[in-house]
């Protein structure tokens, strides 16, 4: 590795970028905790425990430059042997959401249920609803009646809009790594953060802890 590259990787994030990373992770953790505190309408814990990774996109807003679409920031956390790893930072754009998602701000949660979906996340641009099957995720007690759903779908998707949380068939959405922020905070790309199963540093650990709290294997 050239000396310049070694120096680049050793640099610490600036206070501003560290604050950005912590803010993204904490917003994702807040949304996830709020969703899971309503057991009858929450994501079944067995599905969280069986997921390869979880994507949380808080406060995704309408984007005037995307017809019918939205844009926002996401965190992606992979399940590891010890629990849940460090959050990698991504962007979301596009999407065909239908009339049910008409609010100015919407939260999204995606469960990546298999290795194929996980590999997709490691690409430079991952289009949901492409080669990896996506389905509206079951909530609460619906899980027992939806066992076959997880066998067919690589991704289970959910949305929360105006206080209503439900599964939604999310399609036409592109998730791309925010490698400016990943490199600034970790000195690594999103792919490296996810592939290397990094432990979450304390300032961005809230989402990993929340996922551990609500996971059942």
Task: Indicate residue ranges for each PLM-predicted region.
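N-terminal export/membrane-targeting signals
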Residues: 1-5
